[in-house]
Amino acid sequence: MKPALVVLIVAMAVLAEGYASPASDDPLRLPQEKHLRNIRQLSNGGENAEAYFSGDGKQLIFQSTRDGRACDQIYTMNIDGSDVRMVSTGKGRTTCSYFYPNGKRITFSSTHLASAACPPKPDFSKGYVWAIYPGFDIFSAKPDGSDLKQTTKTPGYDAESVISPNGRKIAFTSTRDADLDIYTMDIDGKNVKRLTNEIGYDGGPFWSYDSQWIVFRANHPKTEKEKADYLALLKDNLIRPTTLEIWVMKADGTGKRQVTNNGKANFAPYFFPDGKRIIFASNMDDPKGRDFDLYLINVDGTGLERITFNPTFDGFPMFSPDGKKLVFASNRHDKVQGDTNIFIADWVE
């Protein structure tokens, strides 16, 4: 997910009202959050989001504006919040970081080759939009940030990259064919294959634990007016993300199936370790669309259950490799209103 969308979603969320009291024995957990225990806050201050586990479950990689930075850079830390290190270049804007399963390298997207400065913010005169920066390319590096290598070199937007658990493929989002679609490629950037081709935004892919399926978010305009609006925004490297649904497909792009159908902003889907359920973020229960919470749903669209009840923002969930812990980003317990921080919790079925 792009940093601009993170900021916009959080800005909407902090306007929500009606805080519930936390559970007395677990001060960061609300009483209704029965699947979460022992919630711990790992970051403090600024915008911190999209934290993902290393293959051994001992580290997290995430994006942050800490240290007074104007736009996100990539950091790693231990799962107790210690040993925070910046591993990107410190230039441009970065997003969508992920560990290789063997822990030997990381991947992330960056605009630093296009410009060392932060790219301009999107034009909000066009409404609720976020930027698809064409300067984004995908890179890999050692976990300490050294040995930086460029993976994609195609003109346009290449970002939202994730490594398959078997370590063989990268799924990512690109505008290389004049639309926002999901592709796969080998770890070295070769053998690129387009998986989606319906007009509209297909992005934010994540793999199932067996590397056989991909879950993603999508918005496919239906009417000619909607299509024209989408294409006009895309021409200006913008997208309007107010309606996103969760989809799944096989790793080769076949078997596409829509999972949610609520007309809201559903994003950041991630498979449960059992491969039968998906956890994701949505504003479906807030008529004003400001409050984002975590939900689980079966891959066939049944069994919807709300997981978090924080009245501002909870998003970007990911399970640890053993399925025992959940990491997510939240505004709960923010010292400065609107600050987004990283939290980790024990998962309880």
PLM regions: where:
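Short loop/turn segments that connect beta-strands within beta-propeller blades
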Residues: N78-S82, K142-S146, D186-K190, K250-T254, ...
